């Protein structure tokens, strides 16, 4: 039976490249001259710390980072950007988490979405991925289009397609 897996993964190497490109853009911006501003990647925690001297500049840094991610092919939906700032001394910062894997709540939403579509496929939640199995490739491709079209707040990839 044909099957495929729905996953949510980010290539950390591409994230590192995006952060380096954002830092390069930061050095070229005239509005950040003589300003303590930084974009730092923490690969252990899978997070990016954006810090600057004012909250407005932090928002500018987040936009620079978001554009760099899009240029590197990373969906900006995979960045979990908080609304509040961390403030210490004279620096404002935000800790942006990278969304990796599918949480159990999200996996249940995907499964419910697929079952509500009345397509003749079966779904299994396997850790941080969802396996979809069906009798025909057309049903599986319809599931792919269904999940791509749904606004679930997280980007998904479809891999391990077997016939």
From Swiss-Prot:
Annotated S-S bridges: none
A Pfam match: DUF520
CDD domains per record: YajQ_like (cd11740)
rRNA-binding listed as a keyword: no
Protein name (record): Nucleotide-binding protein PM1656
Originating species: Pasteurella multocida (strain Pm70)
Keyword Nucleotide-binding: yes
GO cellular component: cytosol
InterPro entries named in the record: DUF520, UPF0234-like_C, UPF0234_N, YajQ-like_sf
Keywords from the named record: Nucleotide-binding
An MF annotation (GO) of this entry: nucleotide binding
Similarity comment text for this entry: Belongs to the YajQ family.
Coiled coil: none
Domain of life (superkingdom): Bacteria
Task of the protein: Nucleotide-binding protein.
